[in-house]
Amino acid sequence: VRAAAQRMAALIDDLLNLSRVTRTALQPKFINLSKIVEEIAQSLQESQPNRQVTFSITPDLMVEGDPRLLHIVLENLLSNAWKFTSKQEKTVIEFGQKAHAKERTFYVRDNGVGFDMAYADKLFGVFQRLHSISEFPGTGVGLATVQRIIAIHGGRIWAESAEGKGTTFYFTL
């Protein structure tokens, strides 16, 4: 009963956050995405200091955007990478940028469990999960929140993945 109540509380919190995000006015500033990623990576490593995780973070990737909202995006993407690599002996999580159709495209890449691309269109729906809750915890609201924040910034997000080979999330702003 306690576990179910905790899960319900987490779900309600996530839904409230999703609702707030869709109503939030942007407060854009020039920010260093790499610094935000470094802070989140440090926090993740402190949460499980015995995990063998290598972070590769391209330095000084500057953008104009809402710092609070982009922190939510990066925290969700990096937490997912952390979660879905938890069964790896050696984990690699990368953050960087690449040229993609004349846009600045940022990415978060991991070497985790990945997923079947046939289900990629379900990734960003509320309550959509590609793995069972017994395998990996979560509410199924995080990526929906991420997509809405990216859209508010005028960008888009998509993923490439292969089962057993990891996932890369790409986004533009």
Map each language-model feature to its residues.
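Short alpha-helical Gxxx[C/S/T] motif in the catalytic ATP-binding
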Residues: 1, 142, 146
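Conserved catalytic submotifs in the C-terminal HATPase_c
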Residues: 29, 49-62, 98
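Glycine-rich ATP-binding loops of the HATPase_c
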Residues: 154-160
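Short conserved segment of the HATPase_c
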Residues: 115-127
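A conserved beta-strand-to-alpha-helix junction within the catalytic ATP-binding
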Residues: 27-42, 94-97
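Short beta-strand/loop element within the Bergerat-fold HATPase_c
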Residues: 90-102
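Short alpha-helical segment of the dimerization/phosphotransfer core of two-component systems
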Residues: 3-8
